[in-house]
């Protein structure tokens, strides 16, 4: 008798995706982040669903409903802080996942990579809209500043912003639609994740050497399921420590004040995971230029497969490219720090230099270094 796991139409899909899936025998812990992201997404949808049961998307009651969740709902505070800090874990895993892809040349699986970049945009949009929902000071002013950037688009900008706002300022209509989209988008993201995996399973996983591993594959279960569970336990531990010991570490104190359109906070800044992009936006004095740089800072990932000039896929055996990669990481950390600082000397010039370096490394220095390494191989 055939095993039901291999014969049942639905079980067969699960089996071929998570159990009998052939995986390279040498993939390291950097390959754990895909499964961690899946668990982060499930956690966010689950906690978000329970929060939505108690939340009201009305300007008059939104702030109070969040307070009510924290004070009156059974374990509502756990739900809220799991959701808020779960987003931070989500972005940590996302950035490490993308970094892994850049380091090991996984971007050469163009379809998987491009869906991944679209996913990154979708997750960032969802997180931004979620940050608006508690309707605190930073929520309101963050929404105002970021949506206002669209007014830089020539000709249609102003109309577009008012259309998104549903009026002449960020108000009740804006909050309601942001809640609707914040609820809807994670399900769209889930569907896109399936497409992401579909494309990945067409080619199979890359590995640290960047050499095809077709002749040396092992089943995903039990080897990588056990390995993923270890990563999961470490992530859950970190998340729970954050939630129970320092739940407001990543938040902004201003967001504990109800939104007031008549009082602008002294420094408007987004959550930490958007600070690098915010720093790039602020480093350009021109409004449209800043918006373009902001979008391009993420969109540049789309063209990385076309910028790959090396004869080797992975950076494992390319020391010069490795130096550039870690310079890029240091540059992104610098941008993240600058994004949280006030707009004054010396932060402005540091931000501008870091922004120039960011685009230079990806678009100019990486391809040139790879080209040089190809010639060094001949010596």
From Swiss-Prot:
Cofactor(s) needed: heme b
Positions that bind heme b b562: 83, 182
A Pfam entry, by short name: Cytochrom_B_C
Matches recorded under CDD domains: cytochrome_b_C, Cytochrome_b_N
Subcellular localization: Mitochondrion inner membrane
Positions of transmembrane segments: 33-53, 77-98, 113-133, 178-198, 226-246, 288-308, 320-340, 347-367
Binding site for a ubiquinone: 201
Residues bound to heme b b566: 97, 196
Additional remarks: Heme 1 (or BL or b562) is low-potential and absorbs at about 562 nm, and heme 2 (or BH or b566) is high-potential and absorbs at about 566 nm.
Role played: Component of the ubiquinol-cytochrome c reductase complex (complex III or cytochrome b-c1 complex) that is part of the mitochondrial respiratory chain. The b-c1 complex mediates electron transfer from ubiquinol to cytochrome c. Contributes to the generation of a proton gradient across the mitochondrial membrane that is then used for ATP synthesis.
Protein name (database record): Cytochrome b
Organism of this sequence: Myotis nattereri (Natterer's bat)
Gene name in the database record: MT-CYB
């Amino acid at each position: 008798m055939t095993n039901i796991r291999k014969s049942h139409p639905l079980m067969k899909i699960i089996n071929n995706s998570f159990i009998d899936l052939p995986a390279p025998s040498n993939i390291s812990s950097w390959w754990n982040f895909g499964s961690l992201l899946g668990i982060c997404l499930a956690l966010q949808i689950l906690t978000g669903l329970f929060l939505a049961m108690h939340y009201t998307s009305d300007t008059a009651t939104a702030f109070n409903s969040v307070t009510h969740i924290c004070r009156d709902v059974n374990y509502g505070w756990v739900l809220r802080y799991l959701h808020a800090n779960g987003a931070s874990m989500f972005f940590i895993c996302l950035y490490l996942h993308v970094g892994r892809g850049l380091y090991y040349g996984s971007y050469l699986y163009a379809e998987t990579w491009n869906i991944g970049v679209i996913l990154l945009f979708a997750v960032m949009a969802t997180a931004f809209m979620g940050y608006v929902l508690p309707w605190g000071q930073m929520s309101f002013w963050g929404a105002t500043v970021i949506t206002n950037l669209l007014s830089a688009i020539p000709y249609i900008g102003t109309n577009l912003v008012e259309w998104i706002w549903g009026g002449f300022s960020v108000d009740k209509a804006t909050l309601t639609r942001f809640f609707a989209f914040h609820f809807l988008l994670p399900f769209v993201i889930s569907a896109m994740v399936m497409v992401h995996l579909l494309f990945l399973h067409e080619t199979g996983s890359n590995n640290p050497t960047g050499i095809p591993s077709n002749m040396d594959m092992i089943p995903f279960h039990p080897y990588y399921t056990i390995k993923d569970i270890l990563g999961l336990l470490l992530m859950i531990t970190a998340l729970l420590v954050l939630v129970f010991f320092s739940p407001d570490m990543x938040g902004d104190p201003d967001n504990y004040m109800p939104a007031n359109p008549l009082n602008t906070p002294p420094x408007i800044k987004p959550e930490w995971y958007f600070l690098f992009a915010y720093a790039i936006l602020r480093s350009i004095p021109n409004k449209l230029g800043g918006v373009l740089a902001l979008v391009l800072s993420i969109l540049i990932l789309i063209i990385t497969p076309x910028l790959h000039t090396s004869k080797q896929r992975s950076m494992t055996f390319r020391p010069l490219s490795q130096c550039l990669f870690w310079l890029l990481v240091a540059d992104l950390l610098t941008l993240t720090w600058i994004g949280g600082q006030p707009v004054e000397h010396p932060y402005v010039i540091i931000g501008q230099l870091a922004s120039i370096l960011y685009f230079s490394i990806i678009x100019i220095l990486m391809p040139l270094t790879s080209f040089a390494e190809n010639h060094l191989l001949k010596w």
